[in-house]
């Protein structure tokens, strides 16, 4: 059994009454949520969406240094575009991501159009 934490700053990932056994951080930035989880909960996995700010990426780096696995999303349509974003390019270079899943968000939300193993 793994210890999960969810950084859900706008309450979009898990709604009230969810049945998933995990700690959920809402109403704070992803970076703050990740930092609090690392300090207080000793998570094995942190789930968050829409990584984008420098603070988000620094918090993910801190989590990776602690051995935490991340399930995260980034708004991007190709691996090449992901590499053009300096913060995410740095995470890719570090080997932070094992798998890339591209979703067809505009036409068919939630539908995977490509799955690529990176590690």
Across the structure, where does each feature detected by a protein language model lie?
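P-loop NTPase switch/communication element
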Residues: 1-39
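Structural signal for conserved beta-strand scaffold positions within catalytic alpha/beta enzyme cores
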Residues: 6, 23-26, 72, 102, ...
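Short, low-complexity, polar/charged sequence segments that are solvent-exposed and flexible
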Residues: 26, 90-92, 119
């Amino acid at each position: 059994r793994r210890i999960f934490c969810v950084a859900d700053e706008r309450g979009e990932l898990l709604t009230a009454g969810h049945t998933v056994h995990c700690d959920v951080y809402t109403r704070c930035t992803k970076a703050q949520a990740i930092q609090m989880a690392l300090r207080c909960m000793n998570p094995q996995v942190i789930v968050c969406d829409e990584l984008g700010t420098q603070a988000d990426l620094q918090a993910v780096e801190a989590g990776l240094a602690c051995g935490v696995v991340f399930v995260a999303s980034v708004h991007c349509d190709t691996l090449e575009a992901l590499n053009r974003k300096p913060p995410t390019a740095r995470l890719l270079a570090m080997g932070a991501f094992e798998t890339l899943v591209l979703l067809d968000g505009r036409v068919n939300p939630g539908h995977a159009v490509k799955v690529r193993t990176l590690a």
